[in-house]
């Protein structure tokens, strides 16, 4: 058995298998000890059909297992890149890469009417695989107040209300007295107003004979006092309102810019509340209230004060007294 001459390394031993002497090249095993096992890549590649999987860079042998995986990830084959693109992921490490890793084509029939050349500062995405159908895959990223694909035809934008819907809306806008009393009973309101801040007078009432008579009291609705006054008072003040003495409150007159002290208490004969201790003198006589005059009131929660104003006068009087000049 003859030994083939060694390639280039000295002090090299070669082992051959006796039964496969005819294919000695395939059974060649090198036992050479060297810093680099691949001084020449062609020496280790015995067969042209075999793929060279051993790295020929000497520093690769000093890398850890994790560093070798990272180095392999940086040099992906075409098959591995195609597999990453198929699953929508990428294991390739780069300093900067196109952020649009996944490119999809969006087809909108309504986008065909858009003219990209007529709009400035418009970015579009096109399908690179089908440049001949570029208009079909056009997607606009232009910033606007509304989507141009929305229907703008008045007949399409909204449905016209039917006769039944119109009747229901009309019924809600014009409530009957029975419905209003039922809402006042449960302290709720379904009446819609455009702006409530412009009209702060939550209580509006017309003067009657009992309001301006010799009874010296103004009867207030229980719903108004419970919702707008009592719920914002401390518990001690709430108890004082329900007692016979009542709670002392300040009433500010907007017309005359004056403050008057009255007492608010619950009327023993009914569930209503009354303003006493100065109502006749401070408001009826001083303001000259008559039957049919409409007054307005509201409770100021921040100052715990009741506000008063004469909204309209009856036909017997032309106008309310003017406020004093500053």
From Swiss-Prot:
GO MF annotation: an example: DNA-binding transcription factor activity
UniProt cross-references to PANTHER family, sorted A to Z: TF-B3 DOMAIN-CONTAINING PROTEIN, TRANSCRIPTION FACTOR B3-DOMAIN FAMILY-RELATED
Source taxonomy: Eukaryota, Viridiplantae, Streptophyta, Embryophyta, Tracheophyta
Localization of this protein: Nucleus
Record-level GO cellular component terms: nucleus
DNA-binding region listed in the record: 216-314
Record's protein name: B3 domain-containing protein At2g33720
Keywords noted in UniProt: DNA-binding, Nucleus, Transcription, Transcription regulation
Organism: Arabidopsis thaliana (Mouse-ear cress)
Gene3D superfamilies noted in UniProt: DNA-binding pseudobarrel domain (2.40.330.10)
Main location: nucleus
Stored SUPFAM superfamilies: DNA-binding pseudobarrel domain
InterPro entries (UniProt xref): B3_DNA-bd (IPR003340), B3_domain (IPR051442), DNA-bd_pseudobarrel_sf (IPR015300)
SMART domains with a match to the protein in the record: B3
